Amino acid sequence: GIDPNFRTSRPVTGDHAGHKVYAPADPPVKEKALGIHG
C-alpha cells in the first residue's frame, strides 16, 4: 500500500518537473544521473 506519511516522513529536497523531490533512502546515484537537484 501507499504510506500515508510519505510526504511528511521524508524531507523535501527540491522540485522537479512540477513534482516534489524527496530525499532518497538510498545514495542518490540515480537522482544525480538524472540531474535532479537536491
Swiss-Prot record:
At the top level, the lineage of the source is: Archaea
Q: How is the cofactor bound?
A: Binds 1 [3Fe-4S] cluster.
- Which region is the signal sequence? none
**Chain intervals with Polar residues compositional bias:** 1-11
A Gene Ontology MF term for this entry? Answer: metal ion binding
Which residues in this protein are found as N6-methyllysine? K30
The residues the record assigns to binding Zn(2+) are H16, H19, H37
According to the record, the residues making up region (Disordered) are 1-38
Please list the coiled coil stretches: none
Instruction: List keywords of the entry alphabetically.
Output: 3Fe-4S, 4Fe-4S, Electron transport, Iron, Iron-sulfur, Metal-binding, Methylation, Repeat, Transport, Zinc
Q: Where is this region: N-terminal extension?
A: 1-38
Cofactor(s) needed by this chain: [3Fe-4S] cluster; [4Fe-4S] cluster; Zn(2+)
**Name of protein:** Zinc-containing ferredoxin
Instruction: Give the organism, scientific name.
Output: Metallosphaera prunae
Q: Gene encoding this chain?
A: zfx
